C-alpha cells in the first residue's frame, strides 16, 4: 500500500507557526524514511536531513550569539549541543507531531519506528530542511522561535540531557583514555545502535 503524506495535518501544524506552503514535494521527501523509500523505490530523507541539520545548527548558534553576549565560545558550543541533539530534537518533533507525518516501511512501522528517537530526530531535521527549501530561512526561524528558542532562553536543560557529551566529559576527567564508538546493530543499512568502548 502506497501511503501519501497527510497534507491536512501538515498544514495544521504549520498554521500554529503562521506558516503557509503551496508546494509539498520537499515535505514528502522529508517524511520518507529509508524503510519507506526502499519499499516504494523513492528517495529517502537522508540528504534533506543533512541540510536541515545545518540550518538548525546555524539558527540556534545565531540565537545564542545574539542573546548570550557574555558567554564564551566553549560554553556557547555546549549550550547549542544541549538543545540541538537527538534527545532534544525528538522532543521538538513530538511537539510538532512529526511522528504522525512520518512515512515508514511496513517492517519499521511494526517494530515501533514511529516512537524511536533516532528516526524522529532525523525527520525533524528533514522537516526543517524542507521548510527552508520551500519557504526560506525566515519561516524556519518562525518555527524555532516558538518551538526551540524558549527552551534555550529558560535554560531548562534538565529536559534535554545530552548523555553522549556527559559520558565523554566524565571519561576525559577521570582517565586519559578516549571513547571509541562502534555500531553494534543496523536497520536498513543505517546504524541503529552504537556502543561506547574504552
Q: Which residues fall in each region the model found?
A:
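Double-stranded RNA-binding/processing signature
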Residues: 1-196
